[in-house]
Amino acid sequence: MIVTVFRSRLNPGAQDEYGPMAKHMSDLVRAIPGYISHKGFIADDGEKVTIVEFESEEALREWRVHPEHAKAKKRGIDSFFSEYKFQICSVVRHREWTARTGPGVSE
C-alpha cells in the first residue's frame, strides 16, 4: 500500500474557488484503479491535511499524471496555496482492530 500525505495552506480568500475544485478532484480520484480511500482534515492552525491510500505506486502514478489532476496542481501552485508539501510513503506494517459491540451483532 502507498499512502500520500498532502499538507497545505490556502492563500487568503482562496477557499471559495478552491472548494469546488477540491470536491471535483475527490470525485475523480475514486475512479483511479487501485485507489483505496482518502480523508481530509483541517488542523487548528488552518493547515489542510489530506491522506490518500493507493494499492500500488502504479495507481498513484495514474493519479499523478491524470490530465485534470495535473491542471488542478498547477492552479493550486499559481492561485490557491501559500505553501504545500507532500509525502509518499510505503506501508511497512498495517494492523487493524475493531471492538465488538456485544453478543448477537453480526459483522
Locate the predicted segments by residue.
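Short acidic (Asp/Glu) patches
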Residues: 72
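Short S/T/G/P-rich N-terminal loop/turn motif that feeds into the first structured element of a domain
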Residues: 1-48, 55-65, 81-107
